[in-house]
Amino acid sequence: VSATIRAIGTAVPRTSIGQGAVRDLFLDQADASRLARRIIGAAFDGSAVDTRHTVLPELDPAAGPGAFRDDAGALVSPSTGTRNDAYRVLAPPLFVASARDALERAGTAPDTVTHVVTVSCTGFTQPGPDLDVVHQLGLRPSVFRQHIGFMGCCAAFPALRIAAAFVDADPDAVVLVVCAELCTLHVRASDDPDQIVSNSVFGDGAAAAVVTSGGPGLRLDAFTTSVVAEGVDDMAWNIGDEGFEMVLSTAVPKLIGEHVGRAVAPLLGEGRPAAVPTWAVHPGGRAILDRTEEALGLPPTALAASRAVLRDHGNMSSATVFFVLAEALRSGLRAGAPVIALAFGPGLTVEAARCTVVQREPTGTGTGTGTDAGAGTDTDAGAGTDAAVGRP
């Protein structure tokens, strides 16, 4: 019996920001060069992002000042320490809210969870959010805890691999995987094209999955990992003095287009990519989705869930692929339908998984028509995620 995602839960911060308003906020910065203004306009307008969520209310131009914006409306750049202090306060409510949502959707009692795997690359703290999940949701103190840190946008896949290994070793295991990313904590005004692109696409959010042995949901059939060696310097995530710094060269979409076919080939066997109707591709950006679709010869419908999540949430790093899977499942996938999930990370790393939709067992004379995995809308993580951050 294979490991199965029984349910997916999601959570977003309360503050929603429109792409046009955020673009104008950056354009209005007095020290932005003429070239930077052109790049800002092109990056924001071509992003295919309509809205994002953030733990920083001051990024909404209609809001008042905060740690990242002064009384005159100018963006300021707090130290990495100040940003991480904000993470310590603002990340735990998102971890807890998405985990609670997943457990409720799965109908899983918190005290039956045997393993917790947490994922994040946008902040560090110990004791970590894994303990917030344990304490606030009533998990057993003896639960096994594992954290995956700083692996970037593809980190949900190593987390699912670990969960599947736990379940394979113990069919009674109940694994809770929780990803939470506060990408906007690392926003800053800059003339650097990589930072401008990051400012235009990244948002905040959290997602969780309950993984067990068998049952209805999304069965995890196989995983594969591939590294594009020539892209080792084209995507990176580093720690600077004024926040974490994204390296995202213009070569990334091209490299992905050239290598994604070989990367997913082990999951397809003799089949063609287009034979899989649904692809849950991490929406790292519009160009990445376009190149993936073109390289694999997929119809536009195959990446519909990915484009919807990019439009409504932007790129939430490791949590995003769970949002895409939940969106795909809400579309009403038939039992037995294959799904391939795919994400890209620093290195340049390509992570993928082949899944199968498993329906509920028939009861009485009726027939099962769906799965238990991720059928609802995003959870508002509540006032805790809007907690004020002291100005540096």
Residue map of PLM features:
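Long, intrinsically disordered low-complexity tandem-repeat segments
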Residues: T365-A387
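Glycine/charged-rich beta-loop-alpha catalytic/anionic-binding loops adjacent to active sites
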Residues: P78-S79, P110-H115, H135-G149, A189-D194, ...
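Acidic-glycine-rich active-site phosphate/pyrophosphate-binding loop
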Residues: T125-L139, V177-R188, V232-W237, L289-L303
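Claisen-condensing/thiolase-fold acyl-transfer catalytic domains that form or cleave C-C bonds
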Residues: L103, C121-G123, R140-S142, H147-D168, ...
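Active-site glycine-rich loop that binds ribose-phosphate moieties when present
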Residues: P141-V143, I148, A155-I162, C179-G205
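Condensing-enzyme catalytic core mediating Claisen C-C bond formation in acyl metabolism
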Residues: V1-A86, V174, C183, V187-E258, ...
